[in-house]
């Protein structure tokens, strides 16, 4: 990712998300992973995903630092892709209702000019590139992740971020995450612990 683009993103975050907040902390970031309708109550929704929605909304609203979002994004040929052949359930097709962020979170993202990273696969290399570029200009002490699904996209992005920023604390709040199943959620948390990712909220 070009340094000039990263710099413009960085200053956009400062000027728009800070918005007069005296306690705004530019060294702590929150990444909200794939809080989209299809993963909540759509084609791949679960009751566990629905349960965490109020907690995620509350955490985002109260967070005193930059907030970024990822959005799982597929095209109409999804079923022809490798992922589509392994998981033949259409979901998060660009432009559909199921692709959109949960309404309150979408409103927050638009109002606060949050960066939204559309990603065609589990992890976002653009997200990792962006935050590592920002870290070259200003230190990032912590990056916290919340969202869906713990065992697929949360763990993928947590490990990408830990790889990009090995000396930054990467945190996952388990109480604001849900997996494909409760057991796979727990398995992913244990795997992340082994990769020196801090797990809170269990």
Predicted regions and their residues:
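Short hydrophobic/aromatic-enriched beta-strand-loop microsegments
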Residues: 167-173
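Short, Lys/Arg-enriched N-terminal segments with co-localized hydrophobic residues
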Residues: 7-25
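Cofactor-binding loop segments of dinucleotide-utilizing enzymes, especially the Rossmann-like FAD-
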Residues: 72, 148-150, 175
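Active-site acidic carboxylates
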Residues: 20-116, 137, 171, 180, ...
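Active-site catalytic pocket residues across diverse enzymes, especially alpha/beta-hydrolases
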Residues: 109, 131-135, 164-165
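Conserved N-terminal glycine/acidic-rich loop preference
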Residues: 116-156, 179-202
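Histidine-anchored nucleotide/phosphate-binding helix
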Residues: 59, 155-163
């Amino acid at each position: 990712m070009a340094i000039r683009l990263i710099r413009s993103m960085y200053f956009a975050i400062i000027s728009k998300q800070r918005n007069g907040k005296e306690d705004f902390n530019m060294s702590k970031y929150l990444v909200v992973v794939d809080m989209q309708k299809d993963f909540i109550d759509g084609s791949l929704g679960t009751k566990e995903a629905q349960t965490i929605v109020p907690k995620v909304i509350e955490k985002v609203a109260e967070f005193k630092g930059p907030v970024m979002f990822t959005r799982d994004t597929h095209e109409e040929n999804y079923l022809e892709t490798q992922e589509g052949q392994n998981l033949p359930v259409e979901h998060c097709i660009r432009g559909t209702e199921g692709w959109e962020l949960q309404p309150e979170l979408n409103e927050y993202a638009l109002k606060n000019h949050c960066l939204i990273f559309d990603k065609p696969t589990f992890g976002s290399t653009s997200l990792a590139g962006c935050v590592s570029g920002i870290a070259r200009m200003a230190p990032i002490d912590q990056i916290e992740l919340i969202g869906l699904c713990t065992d697929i996209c949360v763990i993928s992005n947590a490990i990408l971020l830990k790889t990009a920023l090995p000396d930054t604390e990467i945190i996952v709040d388990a109480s604001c995450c849900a997996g494909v199943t409760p057991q796979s959620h727990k398995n992913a948390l244990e795997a992340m612990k082994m990769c020196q990712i801090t797990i809170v909220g269990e």
